């Protein structure tokens, strides 16, 4: 018995005592109590107190030997012969019978007059032992539920509200999150007196109570199982529940216990409440599926653009702009956290997805790196090149003529020689050489403005290529 002095309160397993146990207790505590009439008187007083006293009052002078506070969580819920049972814990799970066979010879005479008590209390002991096991540990004794349950403890916990077996699998999905709010929203009963659940704010007790297996209950039992503490809980449950945000739901459960249709509606309420976090879990794969489809469309679109280098893009900028808006929106959906700027640097060079991600991305200036001196090839349409260069920030009027000197005849002659050599080598495609110099001088008004940025591009980048990654290509 001494090992229970250092155990926490929830490990105190109440046990059916015997007069042998009482004598053994006296032997273990012989340093506190002498082997004189004191022991005999205390024994008589303990056994006689079971006649008419309540369990909390029946041992006024140390019938419990200082263990009343250890068993205090159990001393106020029963009456009658229960005070016999407040004598300690299981020894290896086996209970001793209440006969005087186990007594040694020296204590035999002292307990002979207790034998009538032992004979009459034996049936009560078995019944109360089952009651102890099934009320506090019903998962250990599922067949107890067939017996009538009349003495209920006032402590409120998960056993007054056993989990609903129909919505159990959904609840286990929610338990994995380990969130107290989700547990309460999914229908777990976390109501009750603060004395019975002292650590209610932490996730530990509620997760533990959600994971404790529920005994296989017959379907008619829960009303009888819950109806005993209805009167006790109506007064105390509302303030505790309202602080945890489940006031309406558990108030409905506590007031609607005695009616079978209301219990079915409670189950429906359980199911609806527990399905809401599960729906949140199910929305994630749905969203990723949609973005996957969008990115597949986008990749196909980009592959098509790479394949034929469509000239309609340069001639029909509005159509391309609308497609690029859709493109960048899909890019934002799939990479909202990474802000990948270029999936294909040839086509969406300067598009950065917006961080807020509300609706579609507004149309931005679409800049193509193919106008720079790379291996990318422009179309042969001069109008498209002109429009593209204007988009890049090059101006058609004579502002650029002030900053660059006009070309001399020697420079033009040298350029033509270089372009002829390159053309002989077969590097000319669609009117553009790979070094980015334009060899056709039919368009006189803007040849200077075209020539200067392509030359300057080697050391100083132009105004519109600040965010481009052409040097890395």
From Swiss-Prot:
Residue list for modification Phosphoserine: 49, 274, 276, 322, 381
Record PTM Omega-N-methylarginine, positions in chain: 87
InterPro entries on file: Vasculin_fam
Ranges of Basic and acidic residues composition bias in the record: 119-133, 305-329
A Pfam family: Vasculin
A GO MF term: DNA binding
Region ranges (Disordered): 1-26, 44-163, 196-240, 258-286, 305-342, 444-473
Annotated compartments: Nucleus
Acidic residues composition-biased segments: 456-473
Ranges of compositional bias, category Low complexity: 93-107
GO cellular component terms attached to this protein's record: nucleus
Highest taxon of the lineage: Eukaryota
Keywords, in A-Z order: Activator, DNA-binding, Methylation, Nucleus, Phosphoprotein, Transcription, Transcription regulation
Gene Ontology biological process terms from the UniProt entry: DNA-templated transcription; positive regulation of DNA-templated transcription; regulation of DNA-templated transcription
Subunit structure, as described in the record: Interacts with GTF2B, GTF2F2, RNA polymerase II and TBP.
Functional summary from the UniProt entry: Functions as a GC-rich promoter-specific transactivating transcription factor.
Family classification: Belongs to the vasculin family.
Name this polypeptide is given: Vasculin
The species this protein was found in: Bos taurus (Bovine)
Gene name of the record: GPBP1
């Amino acid at each position: 018995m001494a090992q229970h002095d250092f155990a926490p309160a929830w490990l105190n397993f109440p046990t059916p005592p015997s007069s042998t146990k009482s004598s053994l207790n006296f032997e273990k505590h012989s340093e506190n109590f002498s082997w004189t009439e004191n022991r005999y008187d205390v024994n008589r007083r303990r056994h006689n107190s079971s006649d008419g006293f309540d369990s909390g009052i029946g041992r006024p002078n140390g019938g419990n030997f200082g263990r009343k506070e250890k068993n205090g969580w159990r001393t106020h819920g029963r009456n009658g012969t229960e005070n016999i049972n407040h004598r300690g814990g299981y020894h290896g799970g086996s209970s001793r019978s209440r006969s005087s066979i186990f007594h040694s010879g020296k204590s035999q005479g002292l307990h002979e007059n207790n034998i009538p008590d032992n004979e009459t209390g034996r049936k009560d002991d078995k019944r109360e032992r089952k009651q102890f096991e099934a009320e506090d540990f019903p998962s250990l004794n599922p067949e107890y539920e067939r017996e009538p349950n009349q003495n209920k403890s006032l402590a409120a916990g998960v056993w007054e509200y056993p989990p609903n077996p129909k919505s159990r699998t959904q609840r286990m999905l929610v338990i994995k999150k380990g969130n107290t709010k989700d547990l309460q929203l999914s229908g777990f009963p976390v109501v009750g007196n603060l004395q019975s659940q002292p650590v209610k704010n932490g996730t530990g007790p509620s997760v533990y109570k959600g994971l404790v297996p529920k005994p296989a209950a017959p379907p008619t039992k829960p009303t009888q199982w819950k109806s005993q503490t209805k009167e006790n809980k109506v007064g105390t449950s509302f303030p505790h529940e309202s602080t945890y945000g489940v006031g309406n739901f558990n108030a409905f459960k506590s007031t609607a216990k005695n009616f079978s249709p209301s219990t079915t509606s409670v189950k429906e309420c359980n199911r609806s409440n527990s399905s809401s976090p599960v729906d949140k879990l199910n929305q994630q794969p749905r969203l990723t599926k949609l973005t996957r489809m969008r990115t597949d469309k986008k990749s196909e679109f980009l592959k098509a653009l790479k394949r034929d280098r469509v000239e309609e893009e340069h001639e029909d900028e509005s159509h391309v702009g609308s497609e690029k808006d859709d493109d960048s929106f899909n890019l934002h959906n799939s990479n909202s956290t990474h802000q990948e700027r270029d999936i294909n640097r040839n086509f969406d060079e300067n598009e950065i997805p917006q961080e807020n991600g509300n609706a579609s991305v507004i149309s931005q200036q679409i800049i193509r790196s193919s106008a720079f001196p790379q291996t990318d090839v422009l179309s042969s349409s001069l109008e498209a090149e002109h429009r593209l260069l204007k988009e890049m920030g090059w101006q058609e009027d004579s502002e650029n003529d002030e900053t660059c000197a006009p070309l001399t005849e020697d420079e033009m002659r040298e350029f033509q020689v270089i372009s002829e050599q390159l053309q002989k080598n077969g590097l000319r495609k669609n009117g553009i050489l790979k070094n980015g110099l334009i060899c056709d001088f039919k368009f006189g008004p803007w040849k200077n403005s075209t020539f200067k940025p392509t030359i300057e591009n080697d050391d100083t980048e132009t105004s519109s290529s600040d965010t481009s990654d052409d040097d890395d290509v």
